[in-house]
Amino acid sequence: MERFKALEQLLTELDDFLRILDQENLSSTAVVKKSGLAELLRLYTKSSSSDEEYIYMNKVTVHKQQNAESQDKAPEQQNPLTNGEPPQPSSAPQKSLPDLPPPKMIPERKQLSVPKIESPEGYYEEAEPYDTSLNEDGEAVSSSYESYDEEESSKGKSAPHQWPSPEASIELMRDARICAFLWRKKWLGQWAKQLCVIKDTRLLCYKSSKDHSPQLDVSLLGSSVVHKEKQVRKKEHKLKITPLNADVIVLGLQSRDQAEQWLRVIQEVSGLPSEGACEGSQFTPDAQRLSCPKPDITEKYLSASECGSPIDGHPEVPETKDVKKKCSAGLKLSNLMNLGRKKSTSLEPPDRSLETSSYLNVLVNSQWKSRWCSVRDSHLYFYQDRNRSKAAQQPLSLLGCEVVPDPSPDHLYSFRILHNGEELAKLEAKSSEEMGHWLGLLLSESGSKTDPEEFTYDYVDADRVSCIVSAAKTSLLLMQRKFSEPNTYIDGLPSQDRQELLYDDVEVSELTTAGEAPEEATPATDAPGEPDPDRVYLDLTPIKSFLHGDSGARAPSPTPPHQDPPAETLPLPEDSDPAPDEPLIKSPENPELQMQQESQEPEEPSLGGTEVKLQAGQQKTSPSPSCPDTVAVTPAGSSPPVKDRLKAASPEIKLGKNRTEAEVKRYTEEKERLEKKKEEIRGHLAQLRREKRELKETLLKCTDKGAAASLEQKLREVDEECRVEERRRVDLELSIVEVKDSLRKAEAGPVTLGTTVDTTHLESVSPRPKAATPTPAPDCTPVNSATALKNRPLSVMVTGKGTVLQKAKEWEKKGAS
């Protein structure tokens, strides 16, 4: 009897002790031992109960039948209220058998599954479906070990849980630092409850305790973790884990104690110091924002009203899928709405193509803090978050500063900002690409001439160095283009006192090179009644005559021979008197042609003041100030000075033909130079590739470790040089394409300005001289100017309303788009 009493007391004390352990934070080994002990206690009490029941039933006598029937009815009446649990005994047992444990432990601790008093009617089979050990796989660890909220007043409200089987649970928890069922944030803001286990230095997430392969396996070495606490309907606790080479992980916990416990374990595993209990400014790298949405103030944690189950409670595993189905649509819709709000509330200008702001880790008082850093106006600004509502520290002036990469094993992508050797700030990026991007930004804003390739990068991985250098060059180039890219329509606008067109300068420069003195030309040009200084444009109707030959002679002038009139286009005077002493052959049709041109002068107002500009053509004309309409042909033996003057006075020279030819020549030479440079780069690339191939073959055959290390270093250098040359080749190809396009436009001539030739006007003036002019001698044939202009390849540009400049700009915009 004493042994049974001692056993009864042992069971009671052991059950109380296990209940106390449920309230404590245990190590993984203690948790495993406690679970095994609880399982053994359950099996023992169940097996001993059945033996006692068997003995008890066999000892019933006829005289005690009434008592036995009353005892059989008692559990039958109380069974619906206790879900098959043992009721309180109404009377002492008939035999001196071990009593059941006190009834106070039965409703509160169902994990032990205290044996039930069964009856012959088969209540054992009916009570079996009510056992929670069959259906509560997914909630055991979370509720039994860590799920104790500050606001949880009654534990009887939450459903009891336990591990489904020792082979499923203990195997996952073996050698674990900590484990629990936690909410994990998934794609598009959905939450899923998973078994989270930290073993060694890795975080493992299982869909249920029966799974043997984790859905998520991430190394926590070097990762940062932040605890965020919100007061929405109930306190929400989230841990945001940022691994080095993986997506951000957000875990939802049910109490502050549980969150602090997990935070402490993760910090011990990662080896990073704490960033504060409720630091809320941790960030997500750009490459990870696509797969994991950033936590925002507008995002709501999965609460009881949204999912139909309390946060501090734990739904049954069969209901988990239904919960997800109920909540997934609402989460997706609310998340999409939140994404729209994020875009609308962003303070960044929408037209900015170069990103000059992002989150960086900043070393503050020997601790790394996440700050929103922004570069503008040669200053680096630090903010608490991306809303820029609160400045974290004073802005840093970047003028005259140096940027130096300073990687370390714990902070691979850190760099320093120095001024005269003194460290002003130490920053850390999240990836090699982001580090290169910021190096380029800071180099551009500081005015440093240092090339990103000149930095010393203490990395073994050549790809990482190449990524940093490439990103730095890209951001540096974009910053330079942002402030120095020319704009055709706003840069270099002509001033009021400046001449309007470039063709004026062409005329003056050509005359100066021809050796003509402007002082002597002034009396001839300033004729009475000709106050207009702009003589670049020609009126279409009183047009100059063009000759078939390559050289032409000017009509004689009453001025002395030593005075050379300037090569300007003058308005046509009404009469002209050729000098009789000039040995020129006059055409007999000159008076008729003169009358024809004089008769056309009244038609000039009908053209609306239209002026044309001669752009191209091989014919040359030389109008005289006194006799511009006299057409003559010079014999083949003309003197060289006359030819020089004719060349200088050519309208093509005055009106831009040589300018077009000069552009064609310049673009042609530029294209040839770039082609030659491209061939040199190709040859160098081929040589580098041969050298790389030979190094690889030598490295495969090499057995000496020292020589192999030097060969590997040389191979990395050659590989990096190949990448640099390949980028140069690509840039050169793009430059060649641009030069070819410019050359094609230059060869097309001024027609690309979008103007057209008014052929109807040319045809209206051409029939009259044809009818009135007989066939002259071959050596003195006058040329009808309108016919010559019509036959020339679009050399005269006629516009109806004087909108040449407007059409030119429209055409340039069309070509640019």
Swiss-Prot record:
The lineage of its organism: Eukaryota, Metazoa, Chordata, Craniata, Vertebrata. GO terms for molecular function: protein tyrosine kinase activator activity. It is found in: Cytoplasm. May play a role in a signaling cascade by enhancing the kinase activity of SRC. Contributes to SRC-regulated transcription activation. Keywords: Coiled coil, Cytoplasm, Phosphoprotein, Repeat. One of its GO terms (biological process) is regulation of mitotic cell cycle. Residues 123-139 have a biased composition (Acidic residues). InterPro entries: AFAP (IPR030113), PH-like_dom_sf (IPR011993), PH_domain (IPR001849). This is Actin filament-associated protein 1-like 2. Tyrosine phosphorylated (by SRC). One of its GO terms (cellular component) is cytosol. PANTHER family: ACTIN FILAMENT-ASSOCIATED PROTEIN 1 FAMILY MEMBER, ACTIN FILAMENT-ASSOCIATED PROTEIN 1-LIKE 2. The modification Phosphotyrosine is found at Y56, Y413. Interacts with SRC. Interacts with LCK when tyrosine phosphorylated. It comes from Bos taurus (Bovine). Residues 754-763 have a biased composition (Polar residues). Residues 63-164, 512-657, 754-786 are annotated as: Disordered. The modification Phosphoserine is found at S408, S484. Residues 512-528, 767-782 have a biased composition (Low complexity). Residues 652-748 form a coiled coil. The keyword Coiled coil applies. Residues 175-271, 353-447 form the PH domain. Transmembrane segments: none annotated. Its main location: cytoplasm.
